[in-house]
Amino acid sequence: NTDKQWHDRYYHGYDFIDKTHDFGATVVNIHHATGINPFINYPFLRTKEMNAYIDGAHALDMKVKIYNTVRELTNSCVEIFALRSLNGEIFSKGKGRGYSWLQEHYDQDYIAAWFAYTVKDAAIVNTGVSRWHNYYMEGLDWLVKNVGIDGLYIDDLAFDRMSMKRVRKILNRTNPGAMIDLHSANQFNEKDGFANSANLYLEHFPYLDRLWFGEYFDYDMPPEFWIVEVSGIPYGLMGEMLWEGGNKWRGMI
């Protein structure tokens, strides 16, 4: 992990691959709501474009990871109404609302999630472990083999340790150099039950390559805060700062 820390240079965003290379990046994280990954947690509708982008990156000895998890699911998912018909197995029940398309096409028994206005992408919240996880695993296997992705950028984990082990095995089987990065906002607040992000995801750390503990973390806090709340170093994990520019002096340490 230490060797990777000195070698890997991240570009966190979708841009021309030559530009990211000139910037000095060796790894690109492709978020959702971008040209080649427009729909959250459903990266199957722009696969030709994604493959071409990744081929260009590989030609420059760069890696490309994509945003893809199971926390919520886009309304652009081809199977969305079949999944909705499973009576709450895949999607959590709630008060509905959210983007107008959701209200017009779904019964009002869902929980509205992320909405990306640039691509009119509206998502609803998934339940815990379900058969959708098997779809996710098979889809990940297909993406590694046919699109050439080099790993995942996971925005908060919505599956268990066993699922993470499956993800790691799928990636390693076809692409031994593939990476898994975990991003989390600071969950020490009333809405999230005053949780510690590191403690919340600790069981997954052996399978990760890097932590991105971002929004609402105060990188200017004392060392004790860093060790307990921010740093993965006690567990052998390096990390990045993803909030208001971070603290570059502490980041160098």
Residue positions per predicted region:
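Aromatic-lined carbohydrate-binding/catalytic grooves of carbohydrate-active enzymes
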Residues: 2-141, 145-149, 161, 169
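Hydrophobic beta-strand segments of well-ordered beta-sheets in folded domains
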Residues: 25-28, 62-64, 150-152, 178-180, ...
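Aromatic-lined carbohydrate-recognition surfaces of secreted/lumenal glycan-active proteins
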Residues: 62-77, 153-160, 164, 168-205, ...
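Glycan-recognition surfaces
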Residues: 81, 86-118, 175-253
